């Protein structure tokens, strides 16, 4: 190992040892002795479409499965703003970057067992990520590897020893560590068939699978053999499926729920809940989620660039913030803007872009573009099918988009689809235009760019493709100088907006609610990464 590589490894090892110690004493600053026992009552907005997280693009299975599994590394549960500095060990005791961020070596814990009693080894890690990246020699295959593109830069995953794993990369990529810390990146048991894991969890996490009653609830129970001593504190967790928004809110206000789902509460709902139950703790957080419009560029009329641009110009972004989110959102383009994130375009620059200059000006231009394409008054009528999920948060967006389209002469019929049909339809590109919500695994450009905008990505639902943008995406991913990387990232966002790659309405503020007796459940600035629950306890 060279001197520079040794220095990186030494710093990294030091960091992981310190944070491993912190894992055992997260509560010291609070000055309270945790109480053991009790079942946390939480909620899901829909029945999980399945329990395999790597096949998923929805929080509806990530959230209830997070307590059941473990990652190599994870984001510190008590630090709400995630970064490389908040990544802590989980199944790995420590890690080391080598060869200028081309090789990432993990040294694994030796006292870990799967919930069925089998030992955890490096073979499980290699299996998980070979399947996730669809390696040619992978021993199994997901129905859909939802984030396959996260792992496109991984050349090989090696398991030279039972407790050592090496990720070999094609080029430097510091963000790989953050990807591995995401709630979308649990490690699976190599000895359990994927078909079985679609129905139940066999993990290494703090809670074991108890029961999944379809359409009703998912229940977990304490894992007495969890590898972190004295954890978890809870006896179990119950996630009750309540699909209707008003019924969920009523259950929270009545105290039948201890904590609300980290999604689906608008600012108006949060205000109403607080008024009804003044002791509720409600946190306003950005969770790296955007409401947006997806356009199928292979289907008329959206195969015409002028029509796509007209759609983007038609959207009144400030109107969306007020009417759909009741003030609980900020306007932004390709990445979460300040103050919620750190990578987005500045507000002064946004206001100079078409679609962000003011509703009246932009709608006039939208009508002109439609007319130039032969549509509108005196031309062909435009009737489209606007697809979306049956969830309230999606229907709110779809209704707004349909109204905005109507104002420029496009008549949209909303087609509702449940999640089990929605994601396969998008994967087949079996839609015309969609009202969509996109949430990133963490606040880093790689989390958004690779899966949503790279040519050929499975979650690039519009089939947007610009080879120059692809080149810039790869370039920013391996840039180690933060200022230089930010410059590249801002340029990519400008190009995405110019190309109408995925018209953004805005970036959501979420309102996370729980009662004061719920301790150590801290919402993060990414939706998927704080549901492990090993440190949560009930003060009652």
Residue ranges of model-derived segments:
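Ligand-site clamp/hinge motif
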Residues: 109, 195, 224-271, 402-403, ...
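Extracellular/periplasmic solute-recognition and catalytic clefts
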Residues: 132, 139, 157, 210-219, ...
